[in-house]
């Protein structure tokens, strides 16, 4: 596969033409009476027309046929995609999943859409408030099929296998340790080259933003220029048997047929686009004197709520870095949080739990459910000689953190058969070290 080209910058106002049709963008206006190359002009709005300029999202697409050229939508099998957060009763326990099993291609072909499984979520799609966490497990490419989401944005985190994503804006390659965001309403199709697995964070009614940096300053964390946007690419391809367009609308799946590929956008301009990001480019901030900084310093992207400083969802990573804090228990501290914390592992191991939490699996610590390092981690870190050391080399754990109380689906609790019933046992060996007659702690030797 030839190396793909991209435009650099987060949320930028961009313009792109397929080089096969130079001059395909209209000059000085959006909607001429006749577009260059006799294309159709179509606007894709990601915000209300009257949103303030700094939050106004839209792009103009110049395409061979407009998106409206299709047969009626009809309801299709929902598979394991759901927005019913009352399928099973609530469970406040610490939950951990073993690696989710990928279907074997020799047994059944499963593409990206057929392999979507909703794990947990909260909120209401119709009121544009909430989120869902999905797992994708697939082994084949989408053939003459595309998908778009009327409900929200997809933040896609591949864990195993490379993806080639066709969008109306162009093509993106995606591999583990990269993420991409396909925003609401954007049509895309996914090619895979092996058995493939990953995670999806879906947010309703809002878009992902870079977090405010505050006293960090003008630079740091995920820098805007490291986000990549695809360049225009089109195919003028008729599909005699009909091309299938799948839509998720109000949590349900629908499909329609059309005669042509939807990836017929010759040129586009605007600031409402898909984009990708390599997690290795994250500039890590950390404590360099003492104590363990809060994990918010590792936020890559945030989807803000209406309450200042409170997110519907944050995407947080735990990347390789130096640990140098003196007189400090360096692993993550024991915690009870008003937020919900879903964690996944792309590769390696997580610093607070060396065993049991595996790549391709996950964990959920719900609001106010206690969690923290396992017994083995506590004992080792409490006695370790504190020298500068590398932390998390060769690993990448991440967290979807939310102010919403997440409900787990029936698939997540029962059907997937990946729930680790013995998770709680990793804390059972914790013992009291209390010395009521001696205030001085035992110093590591």
Curated annotation (Swiss-Prot):
Q: How does activity depend on pH?
A: Optimum pH is 6.1.
Q: Does the keyword Lipoprotein apply?
A: no
Q: Name one GO biological process term.
A: L-phenylalanine catabolic process
Which CDD domains does the record cross-reference, listed alphabetically? cupin_HGO_N
Q: Which InterPro entries match?
A: HgmA_C, HgmA_N, Homogentis_dOase, RmlC-like_jellyroll, RmlC_Cupin_sf
The pathway this protein participates in, as annotated, is: Amino-acid degradation; L-phenylalanine degradation; acetoacetate and fumarate from L-phenylalanine: step 4/6
Instruction: Give the main EC class.
Output: oxidoreductase
Cofactor(s) needed by this chain = Fe cation
Which keywords are on file for this protein? Acetylation, Dioxygenase, Iron, Metal-binding, Oxidoreductase, Phenylalanine catabolism, Tyrosine catabolism
What GO molecular function annotations does the UniProt record carry, in alphabetical order? homogentisate 1,2-dioxygenase activity; identical protein binding; metal ion binding
> Which Pfam families does the protein's record reference?
HgmA_C (PF04209), HgmA_N (PF20510)
What is the catalytic activity of this protein?
A: homogentisate + O2 = 4-maleylacetoacetate + H(+)
PTM N6-succinyllysine: at which residues?
414
PTM N6-acetyllysine: at which residues?
98
List ligand-binding residues for Fe cation.
335, 341, 371
Record EC number: 1.13.11.5
Functional summary from the UniProt entry? Catalyzes the conversion of homogentisate to maleylacetoacetate.
- Which disease does the UniProt record connect it to? Defects in Hgd are the cause of alkaptonuria (aku). Aku is an autosomal recessive error of metabolism which is characterized by an increase in the level of homogentisic acid.
Family classification: Belongs to the homogentisate dioxygenase family.
Which NCBIfam families does the entry link to? Answer: hmgA
Q: How does it assemble?
A: Homohexamer arranged as a dimer of trimers.
How is this protein named in the record?
A: Homogentisate 1,2-dioxygenase
């Amino acid at each position: 596969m030839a190396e793909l080209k991209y435009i650099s910058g987060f949320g930028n106002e961009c313009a792109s033409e397929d080089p096969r049709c130079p001059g395909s963008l209209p000059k000085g206006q959006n909607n001429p009476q006749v577009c260059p190359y006799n294309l159709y002009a179509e606007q894709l709005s990601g915000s209300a027309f009257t949103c303030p300029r700094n939050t106004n999202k839209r792009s103009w697409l110049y395409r061979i046929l407009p998106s409206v050229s299709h047969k009626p939508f009809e309801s299709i099998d929902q598979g394991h995609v759901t927005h019913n957060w009352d399928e099973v009763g609530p469970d406040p326990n610490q939950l951990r999943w073993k690696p989710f099993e990928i279907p074997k291609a020799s047994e059944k072909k499963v593409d990206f859409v057929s392999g979507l499984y909703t794990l947990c979520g909260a909120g209401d799609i119709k009121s544009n408030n909430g989120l869902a966490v999905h797992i994708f497990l697939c082994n084949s490419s989408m053939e003459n099929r595309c998908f778009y989401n009327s409900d929200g944005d997809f933040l896609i985190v591949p864990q195993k296998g490379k993806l080639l994503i066709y969008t109306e804006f162009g093509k993106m390659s995606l591999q583990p340790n990269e993420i991409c965001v396909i925003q609401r309403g954007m049509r895309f199709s996914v090619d895979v080259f092996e058995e493939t697995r990953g995670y999806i964070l879906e947010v309703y009614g809002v878009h992902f933003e870079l977090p405010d940096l505050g006293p960090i300053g003008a630079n740091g964390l995920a820098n805007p220029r490291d986000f990549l946007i695809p360049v225009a690419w089109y195919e003028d391809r008729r599909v005699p048997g009909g091309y299938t367009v799948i839509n998720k609308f109000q949590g349900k799946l629908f499909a329609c047929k059309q005669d042509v590929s939807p990836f017929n956008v010759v040129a586009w301009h605007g600031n409402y686009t898909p984009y990708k990001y390599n997690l290795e480019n994250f500039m890590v901030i950390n404590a360099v004197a003492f104590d363990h900084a809060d994990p918010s310093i590792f936020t890559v992207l945030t989807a803000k709520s209406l309450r200042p400083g409170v997110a519907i969802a944050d995407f947080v990573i735990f990347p390789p870095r130096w640990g140098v804090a003196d007189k400090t228990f360096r692993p993550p501290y024991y915690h009870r949080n008003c937020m919900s914390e879903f964690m996944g592992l792309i590769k390696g191991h997580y610093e607070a739990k060396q065993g049991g939490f595996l790549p391709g699996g996950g964990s959920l610590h719900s609001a106010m459910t206690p969690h923290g390092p396992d017994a083995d981690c506590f004992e080792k870190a409490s006695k370790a000689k504190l020298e500068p050391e590398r932390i998390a080399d060769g690993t990448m754990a991440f967290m979807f953190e939310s102010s919403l109380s997440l409900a787990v689906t029936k698939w997540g609790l029962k059907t997937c058969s990946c729930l680790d019933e013995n998770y709680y046992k990793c804390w059972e060996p914790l013992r009291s070290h209390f010395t009521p007659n001696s205030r001085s702690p035992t110093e590591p030797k």
